[in-house]
Amino acid sequence: MLLLLVSVIVALALVAPAPETQEKRLQVAQAPNVVLVASDSFDGRLTFQPGSQVVKLPFINFMRARGTTFLNAYTNSPICCPSRAAMWSGLFTHLTESWNNFKGLDPNYTTWMDVMEKHGYQTQKFGKLDYSSGHHSISNRVEAWTRDVAFLLRQEGRPIINLIPDKNRRRVMDKDWQNTDKAIAWLRQVNSTKPFVLYLGLNLPHPYPSPSSGENFGSSTFHTSLYWLEKVAYDAIKIPKWLALSEMHPVDYYSSYTKNCTGKFTENEIKNIRAFYYAMCAETDAMLGEIILALHKLNLLQKTIVIYTSDHGEMAMEHRQFYKMSMYEASAHVPILMMGPGIKANLQVPSLVSLVDIYPTMLDIAGIPLPLNLSGYSLLPLSSNTSANDQAFRVHHPPWILSEFHGCNANASTYMLRTGQWKYIAYSDGTLVQPQLFDLSLDPDELTNIATEFPEITYSLDQQLRSVINYPKVSASVHRYNKEQFIMWKQSVAQNYSNYIAHLRWHQDWQKDPRKYENAIQRWLAIHSSPPTHSPLSLVHQWLTTHSSPIAVDNKKTFSSYT
């Protein structure tokens, strides 16, 4: 940079930058390197006690001891693409309209990595990104509309396990290991005289596809080797409590049914699914460890801030579900750990944070001024031991986090406000579906909905949620989007529509009576685009009592544009 400035001055070909611009570039040149490792479906509760006792995670424990662990970190949308869109944009889901796994950020959206590159950072990405639109299957483009149509179809295979009986088989998820190797190779050749930012996206511990369940039937196989399974403390695995099907919240019942989890499961099945999931987490930890070890061997560890996080968690049979797509802790709670120069060691931070905080944190690390329109806040003040920094965070960061979900496998747009001891979950327009309220200090398993017992608290939290997001308007907007997308898709496939629709993820149920389901879709398309006026609660009840086929709901949209 200095040579460039000298040549500019000597040649008089360009106007020299202002002194403050030169100062900022010099600050960036002296800034630390950053490595962000983001996995998929990692339950954040495994990064601290007591969850960390169930599986050996040596490199996460290494980061805990030498850095900061955020004890209450949450996804802003518990599904892959929208959550990653929040992380890469620093904005809530409804602000970018990243509604589902098909609809994310625009391809040319300016991410934090783009900003850091513009300010002089060397940048590189490997592995799973999944934050922009159009990268998922047709199913993900059109599946969300099923919540608005009067049928209830299983959209996933029943969760199963698959073991490689090899105590020496360490590399199970080949694609992730290959990307880890690529990241390490890049570190070996990077110019260490300039700061760099490296991103590694891992697929694990996301469940694997289940071809035995049929074409396009989701990913419901928990797959590992004996090498990793031996890292799990089997006796420490907790069998989650379930409500009876008749007692479940209607949205939870819909999710459990579409995820193919309403059948009978033995305790041994449940325990094995959870054990295999934890083993997949152990393999994830090992890849994080390879990056940390490479930084150490290259004498870069002391110059590099390492951040580990995940897009969302994994239900692993809690609340009779697997996958994510829920506001329960298993799905919504994510890991965020940081270590490196300037990061306080062995610090546990109880403040509520979320993935939108990654964007301002990355810029803050680089010394780059933060945009004023971000939904998130830098986590750097919380990683220090000085009370002044912590107080500064508390003054600016609101004492709540927002998460929202608009994708498939749930029959209502869902909004979660997490604040203090409370978790408040609202659905649809706030009237069609009853809300949920949990006191996490007394009910960490979230089994007792106390919304009707504490109406004043419920009302207060709902008003607070509405001050953050006009969720009835957002829900209506998503409802319109779902219908528009389905109509566009139906027109694009023309005469092949029936064949395509029969091979989406619900095809096994669909083929039992395709004419009935096609007629249900036609009735839905015939009505205008306003949200339905009937309650998913009544439809689920009708299905349970008559074994016919109902469900309904609506969806959402933006805060700034929809207030």
From Swiss-Prot:
Substrate binds at K128, H249. GO terms for cellular component: extracellular region; lysosome. SUPFAM superfamilies: Alkaline phosphatase-like. InterPro entries: Alkaline_phosphatase_core_sf, ARSK, GAG-degrading_sulfatase, Sulfatase_N. It is an enzyme of class 3 (hydrolase). It catalyses: an aryl sulfate + H2O = a phenol + sulfate + H(+); Hydrolysis of the 2-sulfate groups of the 2-O-sulfo-D-glucuronate residues of chondroitin sulfate, heparin and heparitin sulfate. Residues 1-17 form the signal peptide. Glycans are attached at N108, N191, N260, N373, N411, N496. Binds 1 Ca(2+) ion per subunit. Ca(2+) binds at D40, C80, D311, H312. It is found in: Secreted; Lysosome. The active site is at C80 (nucleophile). The conversion to 3-oxoalanine (also known as C-formylglycine, FGly), of a serine or cysteine residue in prokaryotes and of a cysteine residue in eukaryotes, is critical for catalytic activity. Its EC number is 3.1.6.1, 3.1.6.18. Belongs to the sulfatase family. This is Arylsulfatase K. The lineage of its organism: Eukaryota, Metazoa, Chordata, Craniata, Vertebrata. The gene is Arsk.
